[in-house]
Amino acid sequence: YIGFGLRNWKGLDDALPEIAAAADYAYEKHGLTPVFVPIEFPSDLMPAERVGALLHCPWHAVRIRQPIETTIGILARMKTVVGIRLHSLMFSAGQGVPVVGMSYDIKVDGFLKYIGSRTCLQLSSVRADELCRLIDECVSGALDSEVHRTAEMLRDREQENVKGAAALLRLSGD
């Protein structure tokens, strides 16, 4: 499966056919069925349906709001995730899944830079051929060691945050 974490944003209309072409390519070349995994309900379902209407391959969408643990579990089972929605990228990277970002904002650029990802395109200029090249790179296994290091780093940072929060709670005395 190839996951997609989409959201409505300025510039998405022009990107929809490019995203659909890349999803069809992933199915034809790699046998990966597109799965649209919304983070925000119901707003993330609309771009999923719009891309789905352009596809020539089978596809699925998570149409019912899931607990966040289930959403993360679904993303963890993808071969790669293509995302506009920052949390789809964060959750996937944290589970060791290679990600392709389509950035609409500095926060997406910042996260992908933070994890050392080279697989980011600007939403305003997404082209299917570039998306397909990055999907190939993610699926090939060439990024596996980098992706595993990223997941380990994110888990370590999460533990540091938990320890920091616990220390702050102890300091508050309540």
Where do the language-model regions lie?
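Active-site anion-handling motifs in enzyme catalytic cores
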Residues: 1-174
